[in-house]
Amino acid sequence: MASALEELQKDLEEVKVLLEKSTRKRLRDTLTNEKSKIETELRNKMQQKSQKKPEFDNEKPAAVVAPLTTGYTVKISNYGWDQSDKFVKIYITLTGVHQVPAENVQVHFTERSFDLLVKNLNGKNYSMIVNNLLKPISVESSSKKVKTDTVIILCRKKAENTRWDYLTQVEKECKEKEKPSYDTEADPSEGLMNVLKKIYEDGDDDMKRTINKAWVESREKQAREDTEF
């Protein structure tokens, strides 16, 4: 039952993360319904566990373990990272984390993700889920370290001596979308014209007048230069 509760809790946390990031109404409605179903199932299983009695009257009941608080989990969004030839290292600052029991700091790795859960730190739980890592990692060789007020997640690179420019594939795609696209075989002036055209379309009246004036002056200068030859 304990493993089922843990799996439901992980499902709930992931749905919450997706819900926070989603903007489409249809997707949000679907995720909201799924969140309600998981919360209901989680409550039912916790009630079943608390009501379960020993099979024999003379059997001592097992020690009651406080369930993971479901109502107050803090999403970790601030972190830093760097890399070596073998590892990508993620640094998360959590005041007092070195004082909680070691089993309260859990990290689950897959080839392209990791899931950090810190239980009962100053009465709160802390969660960080990172999916779609830029490149594959070795699950068996990845690990964590707990230092003073800091958790360090060590993702072992599957391909050593390779550089990660970004932590996740999503971050890479977002950054590349921000870069202007250049066609090396195209006329350089055509790229400039496309940029000016976009500025003109998005600009206000003053901007459009400025671009028109610059365009006319440029054409007049070109015409004068042509007549000199």
Swiss-Prot record:
Positions of region (Interaction with SIAH1): 2-81
The entry's keywords: Acetylation, Cytoplasm, Nucleus, Phosphoprotein, Ubl conjugation pathway
GO biological process, one term: cardiac muscle cell differentiation
SGS domain sequence ranges: 169-229
CS domain ranges (all copies): 74-168
Keyword Cell inner membrane: no
GO molecular function terms noted in the UniProt entry: molecular adaptor activity; protein domain specific binding; protein homodimerization activity; S100 protein binding; tubulin binding; ubiquitin protein ligase binding
PROSITE patterns, sorted: CS, SGS
GO CC terms: beta-catenin destruction complex; cell body; cytoplasm; nuclear envelope lumen; nucleus; SCF ubiquitin ligase complex
Region Disordered: start-end pairs: 38-59
Modification sites for N6-acetyllysine: K10, K21, K86, K119
Post-translational modification: Phosphorylated on serine residues. Phosphorylated upon induction by RA or at high calcium concentrations.
PANTHER family, alphabetized: CALCYCLIN-BINDING PROTEIN, CALICYLIN BINDING PROTEIN
Protein task: May be involved in calcium-dependent ubiquitination and subsequent proteasomal degradation of target proteins. Probably serves as a molecular bridge in ubiquitin E3 complexes. Participates in the ubiquitin-mediated degradation of beta-catenin (CTNNB1).
Subunit record text: Component of some large E3 complex at least composed of UBE2D1, SIAH1, CACYBP/SIP, SKP1, APC and TBL1X. Interacts directly with SIAH1, SIAH2 and SKP1. Interacts with protein of the S100 family S100A1, S100A6, S100B, S100P and S100A12 in a calcium-dependent manner.
Protein name, UniProt field: Calcyclin-binding protein
Organism, scientific name: Rattus norvegicus
This protein's encoding gene: Cacybp
